[in-house]
Amino acid sequence: DFISRLESIDSESLSNREKVTHGMLEFALSSNKDSLMDRSWEFGAGVSGFTGFLIDYNQQMFVPDSESADMLLKRLELYKRLFTQIADVQMIGLKNNRVATERNLLRTIDQLENYLGASLEEDPLLLVNFSPEISESFISDWKEKAKKIIDLNIRPTVLAYLEQLKSDHIPKGRSDEHSGIMWIDGGEETYLRALRKYTGHKNITVKEVHEVGLS
């Protein structure tokens, strides 16, 4: 549906900036179609979960100027909606027998508890790399604004997501004996798409791949 909607757009009517966005979307959708069909976000947890948004990503960012810093604050404001949406889609996945393994759920829970257990002053979302050209007073003011967003919007939403994982997902988490993707609804199709992606053969079957491995 997204691809057909994108194709229906008259690119000649777009501005140069919009054409760049259109091209990027076209590439992203065409190259990641199978991944989008997998809907892995419905059961992502552990290393394939979403805790990186809280723990890692901001530490990799470089803020060159005050305008970029202000845009980053706006990005942080969207985290409330992000984690609300994550909780919602994973609840949909749960209702459709698409749930993470218990092992990965416990990893996510541990990561979220550690995040929420850290003081506001030590929140990883504050660990941004600012340009030396940005004044210390500006950085201090930026961090105070960020802490308000984190305290009022992000942490309560993350806590709600954590409680959902504990109460709803853990009781239905897949055991180690059922850790493979084949054990979730739609898992066989997901596995076949992965085979096509990584082998380059459109019509390959699971049996054929296993026979290659045994030969």
Residue ranges with predicted function:
Residues 1-215:
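N-terminal maturation segment of proteins
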